[in-house]
UniProtKB/Swiss-Prot annotation:
One GO BP annotation of this record: DNA-templated DNA replication
Other comments on record: In contrast to the orthologous protein in animals and plants, this protein does not contain a HMG box DNA-binding domain. This function may instead be provided by the HMG box of the associated NHP6 protein in the FACT complex of fungi.
Record organism: Yarrowia lipolytica (strain CLIB 122 / E 150)
GO CC terms: chromosome, telomeric region; FACT complex
Keywords recorded for this protein, A-Z: Chromosome, DNA damage, DNA repair, DNA replication, Nucleus, Transcription, Transcription regulation
UniProt KW NAD keyword: no
Subunit annotation: Forms a stable heterodimer with SPT16. The SPT16-POB3 dimer weakly associates with multiple molecules of NHP6 to form the FACT complex.
Name the record gives this protein: FACT complex subunit POB3
Predominant cellular place of this UniProt entry's protein: nucleus
Assigned protein family: Belongs to the SSRP1 family.
InterPro entries: PH-like_dom_sf, RTT106/SPT16-like_middle_dom, RTT106/SSRP1_HistChap/FACT, SSRP1-like_PH1, SSRP1/POB3, SSRP1/POB3_N, SSRP1_DD, SSRP1_sf
Amino acid sequence: MSTTEFDGIYLNQSKAHGRLRMVETGLGWKAVQKTSMGGSKETKKDEPFLLGKEELLAAFWSRGSRGFEMKIQTKNRGAANFDGFEQDNLEELKNVMKRNYGISVEQREHSVKGWNWGKTDFERSELVFSVANKPAFEIPYAEVANSNLVGKNEVALEFQQPADGRAGDELVEMRFYVPGVTSVEGDENPKKKQKTEKEGEEGKEGDDDADADDESEEEVQSTAQIFYDTLKEKADIGAVAGTAVVSLSEIYLVIPRGRYDIDMYANFMRLRGKTYDYMVQYKHVQRLIVLPKPDDLHNILVVQLDPPLRQGQTRYPFLVMQFLREAEIKVELNVDDAEFAEKYADKGLKQSYDESAHQVVGSIFRGLTGRKLTVPGSFKTVHGHAGVSCSLKASEGHLYPLERNFLFLSKPVFIPFAEIQDITLSRVGSSVTTSRTFDMTLKLRNAQGEYQFSNISKEEQEGLEAFIKSKGIRLKNDLAEEKALLAATLAEVDDDSDDGGEFRGSADEDDESPDEDFHAESDSEVAEEFDSNAESSSGEEDDE
């Protein structure tokens, strides 16, 4: 059996190069790493990549990122890219592929024009974007985590994130602008198909009228919608092997807002909304928190995610579900008795539920994710609620002091006690004695900033102080200091008023008395000053 080997080959843009070995029964690739002596050795961490002869469909040769690459299309395992060949290896590869597997290696040229408009082709295992009939790039269906129709002419693709969680630059989303509309004809139109079946049962009467009706009932869809539907079908978005463990219908989410059907599988769940769909791996769930809203009508289930869900530039590190407190739901797990006993009985799950909605959903989430369900602790407001009404910047909501964390809703902000350096109670811009509210500032460690919660009722001050002190968090009470300073200032003013009263002028000293230097003038003098006819008047009197 002849063997052909190539060194320095990279599989699917891997960081580690390896050795490609080709024999008559198939081919295999194994990663290698450099040793301290400058040689190389096979790694134990990475398993070899093997392809049997029966899996190979086609092969293509083109330029790659590390020289030249050979892409192999398979029947069931997508496309495999082997990068790092020299140009001189082409003839040898052609001979080996033809002799061992009966496959011809086709040469392809990639488009390097840099245009961002072109045509898309849905091939067997990848989406190909072509410019001037040359492929510009390919997107393997396996790399598409989710897709959403944004508006009428835009389709967004979200890509799988690295499993190792490494930091660095990563392409997370791509959007395609797909203009125009398309008429759906023939069997593609479900309305026409149903009508045709009905006419077949009733006979062939009125065929001419039926044909006219069919032409008028052609459905017009946007090209973006057809692109989106085709991508979902090809990439199997939303389609998984097996049946959901449990399905929850019409669950109302405050964040992201809308009603979603939640299908929960063994290792992940899917949220299917009217516009957007999301997939959440259970390993990304960090916390589960169940809280009663102070309105005495609703309960909330908060699911903290890391990494967060993405929708364009918007991130959702929290899922917030809201339930009516009196609402009840009835669900059953889609597993038989044997499977339940083997996989789910030890996780605290039950085969059927008929309880309050928030209790059922919380219990199912706890069992499948393996996360502890956090509930309110010992803190209560003066009205017996678990949350204090306040504001964070422009957002109004409630601050929930939990046993190890603070949680602010409606826009979630999660603050562990371990990250808090100190807490300051203060009131800015108002008199301490007349103010009915105060502010609470949480300063974080390592200069991570601070959170200022304002407009907290003064009735809650005593309870919050006692809670903060019980958790061993450093507390600064500027309200007490300001009140003490104000009292001292008022005391000084009272002392000054008692000692200095005799030195102040009295209003009694300003009694009215005639001015001795003032002599009242006669009426004639007044007339001479203000009356222009004063002289003539006096003259007339003399004549008389």
